[in-house]
Amino acid sequence: MSKATLAIYGIKDRNQLHYPAYTHDHNLCLMQDGRVLQYLQLERYTRRKYDNRLDLFLEELIDKGLLQLPEEFDLVSVNAFVGNAFITSGGKLRFEANRLSHLSENLESAWGYYQYETWQGREIEAYNCSQELAHIASCLPFYGAFQENSLLVHLDGAASLSNFSAFLYKGGKIQLLEYGWEMKYLANFYNDNALSFAMIGAAPGEHTSVPGKLMGYACWGDYRADIEQWLAEHNYFKEYWHREEEIFASIAETFGLSIESFNSTIPFWQDVAATLQHIFSREVIDKFCQLQQQTGARYLYYAGGCALNIVTNTQLLETGLFEQVYIPPCCNDSGLSLGAASLCEWLKGNTIATHSPYLNTLGLIPPQQQFSSELITDIAKLLMAGKVLGVCNGFGEAGPRALGNRSLLALANDKKLAERVSIHIKKREWYRPIAPIMLAEIVQEVASTPIQPLAKYMLMDFHIKDDYRAALAGVVHVNGTARIQVIESKDDNPLMYALLSHLYKEYGVLALINTSFNVRGEPIIHRPVEALAAMPRMGLDGVVIEYKLYLPDGLEEDRDLVR
């Protein structure tokens, strides 16, 4: 048994704000012999969305026994462009490293100290990991070792020394190809652009929520070459903060339109969003084409926040550039510690095991995963009656997507029901799509898009055949696509497989709405007690907690359904 690896992403932000600024989504991962022992996105524990205060909570997690550190472990810290050092609030865990001057193909030696008891501590073996490598290596715990002749790419808003980096895995080694900031302007569309923020009504502190909103909004419009030219001439209006009147005046002069607000129902803004998305997809895919031609790579491993762009992912798959494309479920910063720990374990010579996405473990009791057929029948009856149910089973998902363990479920055939879930329960904007969960054999029937590994993690779109759009009305977006989570077998998620199979066999139901168990601005539910408290607060019709069904007080008609 090799020494364990503790990896952290906890670089301190530059500003003491009530929201994350330059760093966000702090997380930690403990691995040994290639297996994840414990993992936590900090927000799930603290209940503060995108929480970036790991320095304030790490000692608490250790002292409470939630993070079960062995006597001996190696420490890996993921750095950021804002810095390298990490120290806990009480000084018990310390990490220091030299500032990176160039992007490495390896971990960099650093200095670490761990005080395991009062007045007793020791130096520990420590390594500094770039965000670029940590992002890419976050593929390892979900897809296993990199395949020979693979392109490894990271793309996000800002990492350690770049926002875009590319490596080639060949001959058992990671070889750096390039890194830099040339594609930063594209990422800025989604996290640092005055026009984008204004169109979707986002305040500066809400930058972490902009990408998902803008991608959903873009599907309502159409690409226009004249809008692209206008955007380019004004540097995409990136710095036009609080200069709305100048933007409106430019529209009037260029297009002859009188627009005086950023009302999201105005078609011009929808076309602007669609044009930004078109530019992003075109330029990113062109870059992948260039790198594939340069290297002859057969496979692509892709991570970073930009890998959550579903439209681009789908178009990339459709090019057929690579034999296979791999993106992890936690491809944004929430997966950095998983990547760093996996990279360190791999460099130690350990084989990285293939894991399920259900890795958020701290503070939770190991799941039983045993349920009765009566539970499936009862859940199905409630869903067929138009009810909305929450699910909190086992460990939580790694990353921003709910994949059946921390989900809200409802029938997928009703737009009104979908609006209830998305707008009234989750408090989301009208233009954002809501996604389904579906058995693989049903996907092959209703969609014209081939199933890819990304579908297991809701990271691609499927084009829904016309004949099935009415039966899936609640989850088909305005552009005729659906971001399906595909369930291949009961091993993916036993309860969801059993439920979907029962619903199809008994009622002909093709899919369910599957969206994250939270409301806008809050983290996904983590602990059972939170799920139970959320039921009345969110107006849910019931919750399934550790494979038991709970109904709100006073709903006797629902109790009659499941007796």
Regions found by a protein language model. Give the residues of each.
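Glycine-rich phosphate-binding loops at beta-strand->alpha-helix junctions
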Residues: 299-316
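Phosphate/ATP-binding catalytic cores across multiple sugar-kinase/actin-like superfamilies
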Residues: 274-300
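Active-site cores of enzymes that catalyze phosphoryl transfer or operate on phosphate-rich substrates
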Residues: 216-278
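Short loop/turn segments at strand-loop or loop-helix junctions that form parts
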Residues: 8-11, 34, 39-43, 75-90
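Flexible beta->alpha loop and helix N-cap segments adjacent to enzyme active/binding sites
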Residues: 7, 14-49, 128, 133-134, ...
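Phosphate/pyrophosphate-binding loops at sites that engage ATP/ADP/AMP, CoA/4′-phosphopantetheine
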Residues: 57-74, 288-296
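Short beta-strand-loop/turn "lid" adjacent to the catalytic site in phosphate-handling enzymes
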Residues: 67-114, 129, 138
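Extreme N-terminal starter segment of soluble prokaryotic enzymes
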Residues: 1-7
